[in-house]
């Protein structure tokens, strides 16, 4: 009986340590933040001006102004889009996206980015910006600007 108690004293802390380490492990920089239950909806969203990667310069410029101004995106994502804005330190568990990560840019569809702007990112510090701060049209312009952070895109 003494052996079982001794084993319990070591196993419980060991199991708790494994769970804690797994929970605190850094998130993958390309990990999807749209919940699986909302993915179909996210993929159905389409920009009114066509694909965000090829948006006209005036749309991108408007998106930049919104990103750096009214939308407040730069506060967490930084002016450079690297996730290094002045408020980024407040999000230690799920840091803001690094939009310069081309793998992330290539793996995510425009509708996924728009869904996050519209609904926020559950379990992270990313809040919904539509309709509180941005209109849907403005949200799409921000997506077009975010797409410019990866210089390797086609």
Question: What positions do the PLM features span?
Answer:
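Sequence context surrounding c-type heme c attachment/ligation sites in exported
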Residues: 60-74, 107-112, 123, 132-136
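Gly/Gly-Pro-rich "capping" loops immediately C-terminal to redox-active cysteine motifs
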Residues: 64, 78-110, 114
């Amino acid at each position: 009986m003494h052996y079982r108690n001794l084993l319990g004293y070591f196993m419980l802390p060991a199991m708790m340590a494994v769970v804690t380490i797994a929970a605190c492990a850094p998130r993958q920089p390309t990990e999807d933040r749209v919940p699986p239950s909302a993915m179909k909806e996210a993929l159905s969203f389409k920009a009114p001006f066509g694909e965000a990667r090829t948006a006209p310069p005036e749309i991108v410029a408007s998106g930049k102004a919104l990103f750096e101004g009214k939308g407040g995106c730069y506060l967490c994502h930084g002016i450079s889009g690297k996730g290094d804005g002045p408020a980024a330190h407040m999000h230690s568990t799920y840091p803001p996206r690094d939009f310069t990560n081309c793998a992330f840019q290539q793996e995510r569809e425009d509708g996924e980015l728009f869904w996050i702007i519209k609904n926020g990112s559950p379990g992270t510090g990313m809040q919904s910006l539509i309709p509180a701060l941005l209109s849907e049209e403005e949200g799409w312009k921000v997506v077009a600007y975010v797409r410019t952070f990866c210089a390797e895109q086609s």
